[in-house]
Structure formats: C-alpha cells, structure tokens
C-alpha cells in the first residue's frame, strides 16, 4: 500500500460525524428558530390607491373584452373562453312548446332546429325554399334523434322576398297550431351583390328584414295569446351580425331610394343586419313594454352567431368576390365556428333570455353594438319606412293605424 493512500485512510478515520454528511447537504445552512424574524416584523404591502385600483380594473375589463371578442367570433377552444357561459346542453326542456324557424334546414338554422327538437320541442315548423334540403335535414334528425322526434318537424315552403306568400304561410301556421312559443327569424341573404325583388326593393332588406317583419306581424297575435295563456315569456330572435358595423355611416332609413342604393356587398349585408338589431329595439318599446301587467310577455332580441362555416361563408361569398373570397371560404375555415357553435346565442335568446331589445353575442352576452345600432330615432325611421314600403307594395289597406308592429300586416 502506498504512503499517500495510508495517509488518506488515517485522515478519514479522524473525521467528525458532521463532516461525513454529503457535500450537497452541507451546503444547506441550518438556522435556529431564534434567528427567524417574528412575523410581526415582516413589512406588509400598502393597499392599492384609488388610481391603482382603477387602472387594474381597466386592465381586467380590457382583457375580458378580448376574451369575449374571441369567443363571440371563433370556433373550437376559442368558443369557450368568454366571460359568459351557456352551451347547447344547457337548453331547458321544451316539452309542450311550438317553434317556427326560417331557414331551419341548413347552417345555423339547422343547428337551432336540431337542438330544440333534441330538448323535447313538441312541434317545429321549418320555413325554407327547397324541399330537398329539408328532406336531408329531416333524415339527419331521424337518424340521430329518432323517428319520433323527426315526426314533430313540419316543412312549409316560404320565400321571404315574396311578402304576400309569406303572409299566406303565417296564416297557415295559425291554423295548424293553437300556440307559438318560439320564433326564429334566421333565414337571410348573405354577402352578395345588390339586386331588387319583384316589388322593386333591395333583396337584402326585403329578405333579411322586411320579410321577417311580415311573418312576425302575422304571427304576433298567436305569440301574444300564448304568452297570456301560459303566463310565460314567449321569445323571438332576429339573426344579425357584427357586420352590422359595415352599414353606411350615413344610414337614415328615410326612403326606398336610400335602401335601394348599391353600397357594395358588405354594405348591403351590414345594413340589413343593422335593421335586425333596430327591429328588436323597436319591438321592445312598442310591444314588450306595453304588455307589462299581462300574465306573460313577448320579447325580441337580435343575435350574432360569429364567424360560422355555412353555405354563405363557403360558397356564396364567391358570388361578389370570385378570387378574394377564397380567403374567407378556405384560408379562414380552420378558425370558423361549426353550425352548432353558431347556433348557441340564438338558442340562448329563444329559450333563456328574459329581457328584450338586446343584441346577444356568443355564448350569452348582450353587447351594445355600433352607435347606429343604439339609436331609437333610427329604429323609428326604419320601422316607419318598413310599414310604408310594405303597405304600398302589397295592399294599401294593410296598414291603417300607423307604426305599431301588429299593424304591419299584409292581408291575404
């Protein structure tokens, strides 16, 4: 054994126990409890000042707005990050209730129809143009929810551009049911080039707004009767959009010439979606509030479905934008909501909302909308112009007492 090795063994034998603790453990200092500062001596942070509290509240509010904007417009995980909570599974039981949905055979309308039937709606009238599209929707309902649920769904052909025919459809519904709890004004013309109906009225306004006014006005007595007899809230929704912001800034709704002016695909569409919000505001003032004291009441709200993958955003968008439309139809597709996510705010509006005159965004948040969308004066202009155009283009005697909604009726 070498001399150096013998010296190392001798040194090891004389080490104290603490020196045998592993090196890593010896690096941790052992502090006695007496050396710890009393908790009372630890300085506390002063309370936030009013200015600091206000700043932090503004930051939080700003973050909430961002979360809501994302949830309101995009699908997938983004759909669920908003500050409000509602899912299609939260839809209440609808046993005994009856609904009408325009455009309920496809897209968002189908998402709404499917959900209402799934939650035991007793009868559903779907109004649309093409029987073959409805047949496909009905087959899907039968396959997924059962034939019993499919047997509750009835189809009536309806072209909302044709107000006289729309009136006939509404009168037929009143013969086929003794109650109506839900009306979904969903069908509409998307972002497309300008055109005029046979009445000589802009197609966007004639379909998206005025056709639904005719339908709603004819059905209103039945809606009110249902509210009075059941003592419940009867609900109407108008399919609007955040693209109501694309309506011309100078919109006044003062004349037929104004709404027939070609303001571009986005402007045409945006103006008609602005009308849906204003209609809800007007209805709240002229119908809902006048029912106070009744057993039940009828409320109307407008909704924003978000950026949804539908025929409008995949196919129709190429009519006004043959090339650039691919950005919406294809590149943006991964970020869109599906038809069921797009249906969420409408389902909330027609099953849960108790207040009217709101613009409800996904999943269940009432937003203010643009300045134009908040103008009662503009709402009055819109509905007076609507009354005037419908009465002049269909039957002069159809409106005799002015502007209240129950007077905007095309007599068959």
UniProtKB/Swiss-Prot annotation:
Transit peptide: 1-55
Span of the signal peptide: none
EC numbers, comma separated: 1.-.-.-
Stated induction or repression of this protein's expression: By blue light.
UniProt binding sites for NADP(+): 108, 120, 186, 269, 273, 308, 310, 312
One Pfam family named in its UniProt record: adh_short
Localization of this protein: Mitochondrion
Spans traversing the lipid bilayer: none
GO molecular function: oxidoreductase activity
Active site: 269 (proton donor), 273 (lowers pka of active site tyr)
GO CC annotation: mitochondrion
The entry's keywords: Mitochondrion, NADP, Oxidoreductase, Transit peptide
SUPFAM superfamilies named in the record: NAD(P)-binding Rossmann-fold domains (SSF51735)
Disulphide bridges: none
Taxonomy, superkingdom: Eukaryota
PANTHER family on file: OXIDOREDUCTASE BLI-4, MITOCHONDRIAL-RELATED (PTHR24320:SF33), RETINOL DEHYDROGENASE (PTHR24320)
Membership in a protein family: Belongs to the short-chain dehydrogenases/reductases (SDR) family.
Function: May play a role as an NAD-dependent dehydrogenase in the mitochondria.
Protein known as: Putative oxidoreductase bli-4, mitochondrial
Gene encoding the protein: bli-4
């Amino acid at each position: 054994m070498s001399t150096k090795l013998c010296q190392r063994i001798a040194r090891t034998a004389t080490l104290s126990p603490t020196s045998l603790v592993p090196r890593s453990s010896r690096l941790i200092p052992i502090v006695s409890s007496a050396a710890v500062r009393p908790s009372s001596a630890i300085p506390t942070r002063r309370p936030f000042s009013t200015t600091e509290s206000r700043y932090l509240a503004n930051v939080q509010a700003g973050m909430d707005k961002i979360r809501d904007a994302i949830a309101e417009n995009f699908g997938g995980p983004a759909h669920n990050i908003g500050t409000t909570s509602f899912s299609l599974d939260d839809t209440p039981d609808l046993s005994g209730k009856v609904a009408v949905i325009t455009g309920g055979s496809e897209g968002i309308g189908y998402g709404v129809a499917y959900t209402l039937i799934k939650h035991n709606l007793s009868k559903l009238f779907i109004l649309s143009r093409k029987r073959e599209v409805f047949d496909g929707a009905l087959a899907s309902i039968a396959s997924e929810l059962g034939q019993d649920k499919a047997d509750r769904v009835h189809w009536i052909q309806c072209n909302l551009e044709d107000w006289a025919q729309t009136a006939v459809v509404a009168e037929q519904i009143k013969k086929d049911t003794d109650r109506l709890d839900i009306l979904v004004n969903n069908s509409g013309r998307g972002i497309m080039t300008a055109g005029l109906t046979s009445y000589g009225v802009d197609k966007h306004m004639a379909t998206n707004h005025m056709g639904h006014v005719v339908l709603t006005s004819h059905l209103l007595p039945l809606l009110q009767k249902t509210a009075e007899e059941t003592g419940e809230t009867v609900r109407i929704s108008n399919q609007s959009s955040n693209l109501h912001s694309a309506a011309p800034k100078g919109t006044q709704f003062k004349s037929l010439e104004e709404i027939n002016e070609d303001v571009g695909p986005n402007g045409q569409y945006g103006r008609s979606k602005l009308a849906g919000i204003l209609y809800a505001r007007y209805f709240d003032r002229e119908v809902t509030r006048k029912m106070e004291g009744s057993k039940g009441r009828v409320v109307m709200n407008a909704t924003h479905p978000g950026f949804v993958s539908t025929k409008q955003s995949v196919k129709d968008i190429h009519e006004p934008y043959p090339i650039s439309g691919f950005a919406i139809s294809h590149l943006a597709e991964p970020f869109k909501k599906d038809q069921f996510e797009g249906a969420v705010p409408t389902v909330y509006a027609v099953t849960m909302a108790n207040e009217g005159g709101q613009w409800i965004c996904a999943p269940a948040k009432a937003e203010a909308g643009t300045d134009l969308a908040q103008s009662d004066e503009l709402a009055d202009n819109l509905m007076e112009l609507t009354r005037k155009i419908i009465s002049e283009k269909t039957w002069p005697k159809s409106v005799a007492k002015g502007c209240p909604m129950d007077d905007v009726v095309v007599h068959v």
